[in-house]
Amino acid sequence: YECGPLQRLKVKRQWAEAYGSGNDREEFGHFIWTHVFKDAPSARDLFKRVRGDNIHTPAFRAHATRVLGGLDMCIALLDDEGVLNTQLAHLASQHSSRGVSAAQYDVVEHSVMMGVEHEIGQNVFDKDAWQACLDVITGGIQGN
């Protein structure tokens, strides 16, 4: 699958519907992180500084908001590759010392896709476009 111009536009549109249409963003983030930690309980250890042990704390909720804000920016930049690559390099520098495995990025990708599908409905969700475009984003954050 590719993250070409049409896929990028579709992902941007579906993300705007799931994340940016007045839905409760905190609830959306809670849905995603609940699934991340259900699928990869050991990932909580990566979030000790922001209370990954309890996703209901203000510290973790603030972190979840920052993560979704960063993802929102990356998705918005999907059709501006030069600026996207600069943003991904910045995120890569923030994540390189954190010890996040490729498998853990996959869990986050899957949880984000579940969250978007949950919000917009399975009949319109384009899994192939999301997989390809999230691979571009997480690959960039991993420095690939």
UniProtKB/Swiss-Prot annotation:
Keywords: Heme, Iron, Metal-binding, Oxygen transport, Transport. It comes from the Eukaryota. Pfam families: Globin. Giant hemoglobin is composed of four heme-containing chains (AI to AIV), and two linker chains (AV and AVI). Belongs to the globin family. InterPro entries: Erythrocruorin, Globin, Globin-like_OT, Globin-like_sf, Globin/Proto, Haemoglobin_extracell, Mb-like_M. GO terms for molecular function: heme binding; iron ion binding; oxygen binding; oxygen carrier activity. This is Giant hemoglobin AIII chain. CDD domains: Mb-like. One of its GO terms (cellular component) is hemoglobin complex. SUPFAM superfamilies: Globin-like. PROSITE patterns: GLOBIN. The keyword Transport applies. Residues 2-144 form the Globin domain. Heme b binds at H95. The keyword Mitochondrion does not apply.
